[in-house]
């Protein structure tokens, strides 16, 4: 029997998930959609030949008896409300980041899930499902390089739009590193600091680009994360972990190598969609499989979403103050202590 899924938000990422569930993955079926633009929602049903009902709002979709699970792919500020409604209805919910736009909102979701007493919420941090990151995690967990000491990473985009602001470098871009690195080394963050190197000529007048974020963990690991969103040459994700006994590095995406005209070259991807398309597939398949096989989700938790929110808030404060800022987490609920979200 297929997992019956309702989608809240039929924009770009919503359409991608609808397409992969309908045409690529196993075990799931889209039975309901809703969007603030009802015509757009109806068009998605037509375009993908869905046997799905268009609902006027998230309340009615979540309440539908034939909806087992919900995907929240709407506008970020609307996420918290939809997720809370899904939990209260005892529906499984996959929420694209951000889980909520504030740390307080994330904590409200955490508290509601704890009250439910069941893992219902999965947050869309897809890098945990990328094969390269999985290999890094396995190397670290198996102590291949001993204890991690330092991490060097970079998040580079060829270009960003005119509406991209300085704080978005953290809130929209670095947030993926914030989650992935915390997961990789299983160590909470202690403090953050933001440094602005010389500004790139490619950056718009209102944007500080590039930026370097220095993160210190409670265990003493120091992370330096470069964010450069107008690098021009491609979409480039780097991660190198320096341990006591060696170094492990994120592998480059698979690509042919070309020897021609006295040159040796490989391609660099130009967008995030191609770079992490497989991770998105594995992520949603895991959401479906975990519910069907275990009766609960097993991916990134609401608590992980809370950690990301608190850390990005601290980074934004550090952008403004120029000082080292603390990452002040509340005590982790016992409910989340026993869950592991490593993709095997």
UniProtKB/Swiss-Prot annotation:
Broad EC category: oxidoreductase
UniProt GO MF annotations: inositol 2-dehydrogenase (NAD+) activity; nucleotide binding
Protein's UniProt keywords contain Flavoprotein: no
Pathway named in the protein's UniProt entry: Polyol metabolism; myo-inositol degradation into acetyl-CoA; acetyl-CoA from myo-inositol: step 1/7
EC number assigned by the record: 1.1.1.18, 1.1.1.369
GO biological process, one term: inositol catabolic process
Keyword list, A-Z: NAD, Oxidoreductase
Catalytic activity: myo-inositol + NAD(+) = scyllo-inosose + NADH + H(+); 1D-chiro-inositol + NAD(+) = scyllo-inosine + NADH + H(+)
Family note: Belongs to the Gfo/Idh/MocA family.
Described function: Involved in the oxidation of myo-inositol (MI) and D-chiro-inositol (DCI) to 2-keto-myo-inositol (2KMI or 2-inosose) and 1-keto-D-chiro-inositol (1KDCI), respectively.
Subunit structure: Homotetramer.
Protein name: Inositol 2-dehydrogenase/D-chiro-inositol 3-dehydrogenase
Taxonomic source organism: Bacillus licheniformis (strain ATCC 14580 / DSM 13 / JCM 2505 / CCUG 7422 / NBRC 12200 / NCIMB 9375 / NCTC 10341 / NRRL NRS-1264 / Gibson 46)
């Amino acid at each position: 029997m297929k997992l019956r899924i309702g989608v809240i938000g039929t924009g770009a990422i919503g359409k991608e998930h609808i397409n992969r569930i309908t045409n690529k993955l196993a075990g799931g079926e889209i039975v309901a959609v809703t969007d603030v633009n009802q015509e757009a929602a109806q068009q998605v049903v037509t375009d993908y030949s869905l046997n799905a009902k268009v609902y006027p709002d998230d309340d009615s979709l979540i309440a539908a008896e034939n909806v087992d699970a919900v995907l929240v792919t709407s506008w970020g500020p609307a996420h918290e409300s939809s997720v809370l409604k899904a939990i209260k209805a005892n529906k499984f919910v996959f929420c694209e980041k951000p889980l909520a736009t504030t740390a307080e909102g994330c904590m409200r979701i955490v508290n509601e899930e704890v009250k439910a007493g069941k893992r219902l919420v999965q947050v869309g941090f897809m890098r945990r499902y990328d094969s390269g990151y999985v290999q890094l995690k396995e190397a670290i967990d198996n102590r291949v390089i001993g204890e991690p000491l330092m991490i060097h990473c970079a998040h580079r985009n060829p270009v960003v739009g005119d509406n991209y602001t300085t704080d978005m470098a953290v809130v929209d871009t670095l947030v993926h590193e914030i989650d992935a690195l915390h997961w990789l080394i299983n160590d909470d963050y202690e403090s953050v600091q933001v440094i602005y190197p010389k500004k790139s000529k490619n950056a718009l007048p209102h944007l500080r680009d590039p930026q370097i974020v220095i993160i210190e963990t409670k265990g003493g690991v120091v992370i330096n994360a470069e964010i450069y969103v107008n690098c021009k040459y491609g979409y480039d994700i780097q991660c190198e972990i320096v341990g006591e006994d060696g170094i492990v590095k994120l592998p480059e995406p698979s690509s042919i190598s070309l020897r021609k005209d006295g040159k040796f070259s490989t391609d660099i991807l130009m967008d995030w969609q191609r770079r992490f398309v497989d991770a998105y597939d594995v992520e949603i398949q895991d959401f479906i499989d975990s519910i069907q096989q275990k009766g609960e989700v097993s991916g990134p938790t609401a608590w992980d979403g809370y950690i990301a929110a608190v850390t990005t808030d601290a980074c934004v404060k550090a952008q403004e103050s120029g000082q080292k800022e603390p990452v002040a987490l509340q005590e982790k609920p016992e409910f989340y202590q026993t869950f592991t979200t490593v993709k095997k």
